[in-house]
Amino acid sequence: MNAKIVALLIVVGFVGMFNVATAADPLCSLEPAVGLCKASIPRFASVGGKCQEFIYGGCGGNANNFQTQAECEAKCG
């Protein structure tokens, strides 16, 4: 019985740590948005907790849009 309780507490602890790590800023969980314009601008966005390059159209989109990978990582990890 005690082993089950300990295992449950460990699982809850890991889930709690994961939620804190990924909830740094709500904008980091937004899907990258290309926007409405037709430009082809390399940008970075947080996807699944990692900063990845995407092509931004130049207007519209959302706040998950960074000029450099370093800027993305500073904000979203």
UniProtKB/Swiss-Prot annotation:
The record marks 35-36 as: Reactive bond for trypsin. Residues 1-23 form the signal peptide. CDD domains: Kunitz-type. It is found in: Secreted. It comes from the Eukaryota. Pfam families: Kunitz_BPTI. The keyword Disulfide bond applies. It comes from Pimpla hypochondriaca (Parasitoid wasp). The keyword Cell inner membrane does not apply. SUPFAM superfamilies: BPTI-like (SSF57362). Expressed by the venom gland. GO terms for molecular function: serine-type endopeptidase inhibitor activity. Residues 28-76 form the BPTI/Kunitz inhibitor domain. This is Kunitz-type serine protease inhibitor cvp2. GO terms for cellular component: extracellular space. Belongs to the venom Kunitz-type family. Serine protease inhibitor. InterPro entries: Kunitz_BPTI (IPR002223), Kunitz_BPTI_sf (IPR036880), Prtase_inh_Kunz-CS (IPR020901), TFPI/VKTCI-like (IPR050098). Keywords: Disulfide bond, Protease inhibitor, Secreted, Serine protease inhibitor, Signal. Disulfide bonds join 28-76, 37-59, 51-72.
